[in-house]
């Protein structure tokens, strides 16, 4: 074990951290267990992350944030929960939830189980559930995609807003013949 650890350089650990977002000690351990093979270390971290995610699955995720995305005549809203408010304010977690919202905009899934089983838009080799497990491993808390909804309005527009620092989100469907975005304020 000592010889393996010596072969792992700080530069290798840094590179693996940048590739995966995993913690320093996890990256060091992965490289040591795979004789410094970067590809095998990534796979080791992925498998280890799934195991960590499974261990955290029983913990209550009662905090979290709501994100919305509006593109043209279509919109989506998602709620993703975390265990602590601290994580809910984390920039990486927020970016992940934005990705989940983008996924929800294009999904054909009727419920959460179908949503989790579909191919992840950001990496088609993974499912949404795989991406979630990866985030759980990186962030170190149980996370849960609690719910999502889509809205489509062909004869008007959709607006969105977020209340209370991401705790409450709203999609508003406005049916109107006003098509110019600059004129929409007069409608609402």
Q: Model regions: which residues?
A:
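N-terminal assembly/interaction segments in proteins that build large macromolecular machines
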Residues: 6-188
């Amino acid at each position: 074990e000592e010889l393996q650890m010596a072969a792992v350089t700080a530069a290798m650990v840094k590179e693996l951290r940048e590739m995966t977002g995993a913690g320093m000690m996890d990256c060091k351990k992965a490289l040591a267990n795979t004789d410094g093979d970067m590809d095998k270390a990534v796979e080791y971290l992925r498998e280890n992350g799934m195991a960590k995610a499974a261990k955290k699955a029983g913990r209550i995720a009662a905090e979290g944030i709501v994100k919305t995305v509006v593109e043209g005549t279509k919109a989506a809203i998602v709620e993703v929960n975390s265990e602590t408010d601290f994580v809910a304010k984390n920039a990486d977690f927020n970016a992940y939830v934005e990705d989940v919202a983008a996924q929800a905009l294009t999904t054909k899934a009727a419920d959460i189980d179908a949503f989790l089983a579909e191919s992840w838009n950001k990496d088609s080799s993974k499912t949404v559930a795989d991406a979630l497990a990866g985030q759980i491993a990186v962030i170190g808390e149980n996370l849960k995609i609690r719910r999502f909804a889509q809205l489509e309005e062909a004869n008007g527009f959709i607006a969105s807003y977020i209340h209370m620092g991401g705790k409450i989100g709203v999609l508003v469907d406005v049916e109107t013949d006003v098509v110019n975005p600059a004129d929409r304020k007069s409608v609402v």
